[in-house]
Amino acid sequence: MEREILAYIKQNRMIGKNDVVLAGVSGGSDSMAMLRILKELQGKLDFTLRVVHIHHGIRGKEADRDQSFVENICRKWQIPCTVYCYDVPGLSREWKLGEEETGRIVRKEAFQREAAVCGRKDSEIKIALAHNQEDLAETMLHNLCRGTGLRGLCTMRPVDGELSLIHISEPTRQEAIS
């Protein structure tokens, strides 16, 4: 699978030499598979890898365990890791938004803060998020129900947005965990 993902990254010009890749890692199987693959590809593509973990303040002890797990793996694999903590339920009430929307806002803020710490041009900073084919299908159906246009039906593109948002999206969930 690593060979296919390397080809996919090169074909879509997702990571360039000397880029900084900020990997969003939740501790779930998809993001851990992505992190393992990025760690393996780091030497082949010559980029700097950093992990961003976001504690949303929603799932209590379970979220605390996810944070510890991610921090321990990063320490073991010698990958710099920054944890951003937010009180998403409190912010949702304050901002009068749903928790899902508030979560999107704080995640974007966390990546912008981490990108600023890197001291590089935006074009040299990539944000990697793990999505599998099931996630893509779910996003497409959600967008269709919302009455989206053609752009929304395209779901998640491999590289998108201000800081080159990377979606590692080729494997299915089963392939990612095997």
Language-model-detected regions and their locations in the chain:
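Single conserved hydrophobic/aromatic residue that forms the stacking wall/gate
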Residues: 166-178
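Core alpha/beta nucleotide-donor-binding catalytic domains of modification enzymes
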Residues: 1-25, 29-165, 169
